[in-house]
């Protein structure tokens, strides 16, 4: 179930303040955040936000088509290493 429309989208206040402060600067440093739950607003477009995946911050460049999604959608938390397969080398028949 999604979020109620009457509540509106959510973004952490500290993240909004950092993005607004960065819009005034010419040089745009990477913004570090742990807030994977924040919704991407149109004001975020053009910013690079480093989102925490549980062990490191992964930089994400915000584009037009990302607006409305959550930051955590673009940084997976789990690494898929593949399913177990037949190991032909060790079967000693």
From Swiss-Prot:
Signal peptide boundaries: none
InterPro entries in the cross-refs: Ribosomal_uS19, Ribosomal_uS19_bac-type, Ribosomal_uS19_CS, Ribosomal_uS19_SF
Upper classification of the organism: Bacteria, Bacillati, Bacillota, Bacilli, Lactobacillales
Homology family: Belongs to the universal ribosomal protein uS19 family.
Matching HAMAP family: Ribosomal_uS19
Record's keyword terms, sorted: Ribonucleoprotein, Ribosomal protein, RNA-binding, rRNA-binding
One GO MF term attached to the UniProt entry: rRNA binding
Pfam families the record matches: Ribosomal_S19
Biological process according to GO: ribosomal small subunit assembly; translation
RNA-binding is among the record's keywords: yes
Functional summary from the UniProt entry: Protein S19 forms a complex with S13 that binds strongly to the 16S ribosomal RNA.
Top-level lineage group: Bacteria
The protein, known as: Small ribosomal subunit protein uS19
Gene Ontology annotations for the cellular component aspect, listed alphabetically: cytoplasm; small ribosomal subunit
SUPFAM superfamilies found in the cross-reference section: Ribosomal protein S19
Keyword RNA-binding (UniProt): yes
């Amino acid at each position: 179930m999604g979020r109620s429309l009457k509540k509106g989208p959510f973004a952490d206040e500290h993240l909004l303040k950092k993005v607004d402060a960065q819009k005034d600067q010419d040089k745009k440093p990477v913004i570090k955040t742990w807030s994977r739950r924040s919704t991407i607003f149109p004001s975020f477009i053009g910013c690079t936000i480093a989102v925490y995946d549980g062990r490191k911050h992964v930089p994400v460049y915000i584009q037009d088509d990302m607006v409305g999604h959550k930051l955590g959608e673009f940084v997976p938390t789990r690494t898929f290493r593949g399913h177990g397969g037949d190991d032909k080398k060790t079967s000693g028949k």
